[in-house]
């Protein structure tokens, strides 16, 4: 069967977006892994699925699958692309959209020239909300790594789990070595996204993220939210911060006790069709 899809990206964090309202398809783990292959498939960090909502207050249901086929709760760059996709495909004429995710409701607002502002919901910090194994809540935790190496982390749930550590320079940070250890650390029973943040000043940070089930990506929207909130909680950052990632910049806003707002661009790369039989086992 032919499957229609759209390739999009948010700051280089790239997606295959599939409308399963207007067409039907079954995409299992092995099929998603084959589609994600950058040599023999479409190639993407995440697969984004558009479905009818299960709850009356939502316009759409938004499902996210990593390149390894695992389903995850949230993707910030993805939700911006999702919002643009459903609007440009005329699945809705709304510019303020209510979207159901595994993590709850998010509310993207479409702006001009592909820019989208998203209400990302409330950050969570308690260990059982991440989830993270700890005897009691703390501002910072020490994580034991291989070769007697320790790092200091903050933990934040932005619809998906994040560990944030501050580094002197993101360019020289050992993301490839430390990232996988943090991602699969036994204290994170559902694994975690590992963020490495360099504070430039109180309104500007640089960030690299080793994403759960994907590896390091050019950008991570929820990671940018988690890092900014972590820095704000530590008193290092103002309430509106520019987060600079390899793929570009996001603006993150947060006031204590309020929701997090993320603003950033989206890019429509191309539309395509493929014969799904070649990707199924």
UniProtKB/Swiss-Prot annotation:
Keyword hit for Cytoplasm: yes
Positions with a binding annotation for substrate: 13, 46, 66, 76-77, 160, 193, 211-212, 221-222
Any one biological process term the GO annotation gives: lysine biosynthetic process via diaminopimelate
Alphabetical list of InterPro entries matching this protein: DAP_epimerase_AS, DAP_epimerase_DapF
Pathway in which the depicted protein is active: Amino-acid biosynthesis; L-lysine biosynthesis via DAP pathway; DL-2,6-diaminopimelate from LL-2,6-diaminopimelate: step 1/1
Reactions catalysed: (2S,6S)-2,6-diaminopimelate = meso-2,6-diaminopimelate
UniProt main location, coarse: cytoplasm
Site label Important for dimerization, positions: 270
Site for Could be important to modulate the pK values of the two catalytic cysteine residues, residues: 162, 211
Known function: Catalyzes the stereoinversion of LL-2,6-diaminopimelate (L,L-DAP) to meso-diaminopimelate (meso-DAP), a precursor of L-lysine and an essential component of the bacterial peptidoglycan.
Subunit structure, interactors included: Homodimer.
Family: Belongs to the diaminopimelate epimerase family.
Protein name: Diaminopimelate epimerase
Source organism of this protein record: Acinetobacter baumannii (strain ACICU)
